[in-house]
């Protein structure tokens, strides 16, 4: 059941997104009853200024859903409409709308004066009988009840209210009962210390090998295009050669969780194949287009793997997946943006629910957001997941924000989401160019025996020789590494911060203590100076001496529209012999 206001259902684009989900496999609910509290006014805006359609419920025509327009003063008609709507929903598993046409007796809130903006309307409302009296008069006129019965009902109801009020005054504090309490009984409320503790995400090598065989074996009795055959078979080769790439990290993370009995749900635009053609979680049979999900073939007792290409929506789909994660703490619920830049279409969900829902309503949530991020010359709308905005929302213990640079770390951070004794939203800035980068591979033992590393030291740097200590995150590390090697700079150490929040402060302090001889400490980022993680890092490096920034200069847009200019900017940042900011 979804309750709307008349102004909102007509004016909010989210409504259209949700209505379009009604019959889609990944999002349908078996029918939704939409109840519109239609008071013919939106705060101070008249309905004639609030929509172009005749009815506020005309959005229901998109799915040919029935709409019941009912007079809110007619109690029996309202009950009849609600019963009919529910019967329709249960019988046909489709949406139905109830347009409950009434009025708002007072202002938008207790202190509001509605006669400022609708004097004529409120003159009529002030003279209008309320629904209780209208219905009472009807029942009395039909000799069904008498006045004494009405007075008795009113007295009992007022006594009940007074009793509840007195009980509430005796309580020292108000306790919020968590939504879906039973599903969340065995989960802890994690503070920062617990969030920084190592979670055991190891997984037996033999089982990893079994999963690799499953995801690299196509049914022999079906035809597939040559490219997909080659791609799927390469997964086993990769495992045997002990060089696992990003796609394998994802598949093995999902497969290992499924084998342990957890469910996995992935949703978003083009997620079945992956925007950058790396995932191929759904394989299409060439002749029939039958869909094959190899991750559902791991074992008879495994969890269920669900993956859905979403409609072209961010706000509605992120909202749906947030709700799904709220109801399913034992499911890895993943929403992936087509490009990280597009997640701003869901900004309301991120601001009001994902970043602050647990703090406001005591409702934990383990949703994962994967945001492809990185500067490869694709322009302002295809380069940045707006890292700075997510980090600005971080406080105390509200969520994880990460920017992984190795497949193994991606494997472990996904497993950590369900292996931890708590649930927190996880924002991961994922790579694009690293998906097939020859240096971006991990060994099988990094998966089977390792754990998530929030901080990765430079294992090739000689601390005694190091003069410049560079902190960096994500994909940009490989650009700096290439520049360091080309320039033969053995006096530079590159340290990767893989988890941006909560920040591994103790680990960073150990790194600073280790490199005692440095006189140049750098935070390096490929984003402009007014974006990226710089603002977040300033809060934590403000007391560090000899600290500076290497970045692109401040821009209004996240990236340049020219690939050539973007590459030149990168060279200026990554080569210390040139200006570190342009």
Language-model segments: which ranges?
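Hard-cation-handling environments
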Residues: 131, 142, 147-264
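Acidic beta-strand-to-loop metal/phosphate-binding motif
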Residues: 100, 518-527
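Thiamine diphosphate
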Residues: 1-43, 47-58, 67-93, 244, ...
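Short acidic (Asp/Glu) and glycine-rich catalytic loops that position anionic groups and cofactors
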Residues: 35-39, 59-66, 109-118, 130-142, ...
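ASCE RecA-like P-loop NTPase motor cores
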Residues: 220, 257-258, 264, 272, ...
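Glycine-rich ThDP/TPP pyrophosphate-binding loop and its adjacent helix/strand module
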Residues: 1-169, 341, 376-378, 396-513
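Single conserved hydrophobic/aromatic residue that forms the stacking wall/gate
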Residues: 571-582
């Amino acid at each position: 059941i979804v309750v709307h206001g008349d102004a909102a259902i007509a004016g909010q684009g989210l409504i259209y997104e949700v209505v379009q989900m009604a019959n889609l496999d990944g999002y349908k609910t078996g029918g939704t009853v939409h109840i519109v509290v239609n008071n013919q006014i939106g705060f101070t805006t008249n309905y004639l200024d609030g929509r172009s359609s005749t009815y506020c419920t005309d959005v229901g025509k998109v799915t040919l859903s029935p709409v019941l327009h009912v007079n809110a003063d007619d109690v029996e008609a309202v009950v009849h409409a609600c019963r009919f709507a529910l019967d329709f929903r249960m019988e046909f598993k489709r949406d139905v709308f109830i347009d409950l046409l009434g009025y708002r007796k007072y202002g938008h809130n207790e202190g509001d004066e509605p006669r400022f903006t609708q004097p004529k309307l409120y003159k009529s409302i002030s003279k209008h009988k309320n629904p209780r009296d209208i219905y009472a008069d009807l029942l009395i006129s039909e000799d069904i009840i008498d006045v004494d019965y009405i007075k008795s009902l009113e007295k009992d109801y007022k006594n009940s209210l007074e009793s509840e009020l007195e009980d509430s005054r005796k309580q020292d504090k108000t306790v919020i009962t968590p939504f879906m309490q039973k599903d969340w009984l065995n989960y802890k409320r994690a503070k920062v210390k617990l969030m920084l503790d190592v979670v055991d995400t190891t997984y037996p090598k033999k089982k990893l090998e079994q999963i690799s065989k499953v995801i690299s074996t196509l049914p022999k009795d079906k035809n597939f295009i040559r490219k997909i055959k080659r791609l799927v078979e390469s997964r086993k080769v990769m495992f045997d050669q002990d060089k696992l790439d990003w796609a394998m990290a994802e598949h093995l993370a999902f497969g290992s969780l499924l084998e342990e009995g957890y469910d996995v749900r992935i949703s978003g635009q083009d997620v079945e194949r992956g925007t950058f053609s790396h995932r191929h979680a759904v394989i299409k049979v060439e002749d029939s287009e039958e869909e094959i999900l190899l991750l559902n073939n791991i074992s008879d007792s495994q969890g269920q793997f669900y993956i859905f290409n979403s409609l072209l929506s961010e706000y509605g789909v992120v909202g749906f997946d947030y709700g799904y994660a709220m109801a399913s703490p034992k499911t890895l619920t993943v929403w992936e943006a087509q490009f990280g830049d597009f997640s701003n279409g869901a900004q309301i969900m991120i601001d009001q629910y994902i970043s602050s829902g647990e703090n406001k309503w005591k409702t934990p949530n383990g949703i994962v957001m994967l945001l492809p991020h990185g500067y490869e010359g694709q322009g302002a709308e295809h380069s940045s997941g707006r890292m700075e905005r997510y980090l600005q929302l971080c406080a105390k213990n509200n969520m994880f924000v990460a920017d992984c640079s190795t497949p193994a770390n991606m494997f472990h951070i996904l497993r950590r989401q369900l292996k931890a004794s708590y649930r927190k939203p996880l924002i991961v800035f994922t790579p694009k160019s690293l998906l097939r980068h020859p240096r971006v591979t991990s060994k099988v033992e990094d998966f089977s025996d390792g754990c998530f590393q929030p901080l990765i030291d430079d294992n090739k740097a000689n601390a005694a020789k190091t003069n410049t200590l560079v902190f960096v995150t994500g994909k940009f590390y490989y650009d700096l590494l290439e520049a360091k090697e080309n320039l033969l700079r053995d006096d530079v150490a590159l340290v990767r911060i893989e988890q941006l929040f909560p920040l591994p402060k103790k680990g960073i302090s150990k790194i600073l203590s280790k490199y005692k001889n440095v006189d140049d400490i750098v935070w390096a980022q490929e984003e402009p100076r007014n974006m990226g993680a710089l603002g977040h890092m300033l809060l934590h490096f403000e007391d560090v001496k000899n600290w500076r920034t290497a970045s692109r200069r401040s821009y209004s847009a996240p990236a340049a529209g020219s690939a050539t200019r973007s590459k030149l900017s990168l060279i200026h940042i990554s080569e210390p012999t040139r200006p570190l900011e342009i």
